[in-house]
Amino acid sequence: MKFIDEATIIVAAGDGGNGCISFRREKYIPFGPAEGGDGGNGGNVWLQADENLNTLIDYHFQHNFHAENGKHGQGKNFTGKCGKDLTIKVPIGTRVVDQNTNEILGDLIVHQQYLLVAKGGLRGLGNNHFKSSANCTPRKKTNGTKGEIRRLQLELILLADVGLLGLPNVGKSTLIRAVSAAKPKVANYPFTTLVPNLGVVQVHKKQSFIIADIPGLIKGAADGAGLGIRFLKHLERCRILLHLIDLAPADQSSPVENASIIINELKRYSEKLATKPSWLVFNKLDLIDKREALNIAQTISDALNQKHNYYLISAMNHQGIKTLCRDIMLFINKNK
């Protein structure tokens, strides 16, 4: 199924039913008291997180949603039936924004979590509500109020513990294939990854973490170049970022300059994202002498003022991966 992580929908809660003007009329009571019933409340609109969904594609085809209106009141003090609530299911990780005010209404991050997005209108009152000892036959009632109408921006932000960052073709997809059961496309050309991929890394029997791979970033990504900038939001909820660096770029580019590109683009996109815990992971150790790899890694680590230890791995040969995954698990457990 196509991965769609943004959608716009219009939700309308139900209107409240009107109150009724009615009087008791029986054979021997020609001018009885008021007995007009109240209307029913309008139905609310809710969003509900569903772990069985992973895309917002359905809402690219259906944009308008309306809860049921409340029924009008009737004679003999019959209250109108309340309108049924409408529940719209969305993937876990969906952020809901009111497009008119840019207010974030909520984040749905737990299975079956509910969020009220449009409140139904209140019921109108029948004339029975307005009778008194001085006036038992009032000709007064109120109409139900209108239900809320909202234009909502739905943004799916993946829930992952670890996010992979890097230029195109540095081996992010190869790494996620090596450490999990995920099977993203892998090929020797840029932008093989077109959408984010998630993988579950099982470190021990009862310990695992989720890792996210997004399309590679390029210089100018913060200005819209390439594919990765659109998907950077999926790293917002990650606890730690792994910055993958190619030790032996096929285009003979400088690993130091390549590392700086990612750091700069991340800062330009979001200072908050740029300050997340980030580890340097140097990939393709199988293509270069280990001593040379250590020199490159140390140079880049010093240039970027990296405080945490860096890692040398070969995603292709699974070299150094076990240690990396173990340390990630320790970090996650420590920072819960």
Curated annotation (Swiss-Prot):
GTP binds at residues 166-173, 191-195, 213-216, 283-286, 314-316. The keyword rRNA-binding does not apply. Residues 160-333 form the OBG-type G domain. Residues 1-159 form the Obg domain. It is found in: Cytoplasm. The keyword Magnesium applies. Belongs to the TRAFAC class OBG-HflX-like GTPase superfamily. OBG GTPase family. This is GTPase Obg. It comes from Baumannia cicadellinicola subsp. Homalodisca coagulata.
